[in-house]
């Protein structure tokens, strides 16, 4: 069964090791007849989560007006979500952390997704 694979690149470097690794993964997924979509976080505007929890009261709709709405749409469509990023100071880089924090708005919709870190 073909899957819809979403690769989210969270490195600030466009052609670093993370991009190379993600590109190799994408090539393998495509060769196995899966549809692949890529999002490069450094090219997106993502506002920090304010922790207001309004998203929990209105069906996962965040009040921030930025590129996360596009990312949410792609996450909803995907069967497999790959989070590709380097490790900086023992954790996610800030680009990836900001995006992950904002997925609080859609956490109930992500339970059945298959994530690869």
Which role does the model predict for each range below?
Residues 63-117:
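Helix-loop-strand module that forms the ligand-binding subsite of alpha/beta enzymes
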Residues 32, 58, 77-78:
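Structured helix-beta-strand junction loops
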């Amino acid at each position: 069964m073909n899957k819809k694979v979403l690769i989210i690149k969270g490195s600030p470097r466009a052609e670093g090791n993370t991009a190379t690794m993600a590109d190799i993964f994408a090539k393998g997924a495509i060769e196995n007849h899966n549809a692949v979509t890529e999002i490069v976080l450094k090219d997106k505007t993502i506002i920090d989560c304010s922790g207001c929890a309004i998203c929990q009261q209105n069906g996962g709709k965040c009040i921030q007006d930025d590129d996360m709405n596009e990312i949410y749409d792609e996450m909803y469509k995907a069967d497999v979500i790959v989070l590709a990023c380097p490790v900086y100071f023992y954790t996610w880089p800030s680009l990836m952390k900001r995006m992950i924090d904002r997925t609080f708005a859609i956490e109930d919709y992500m339970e059945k997704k298959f994530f690869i870190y």
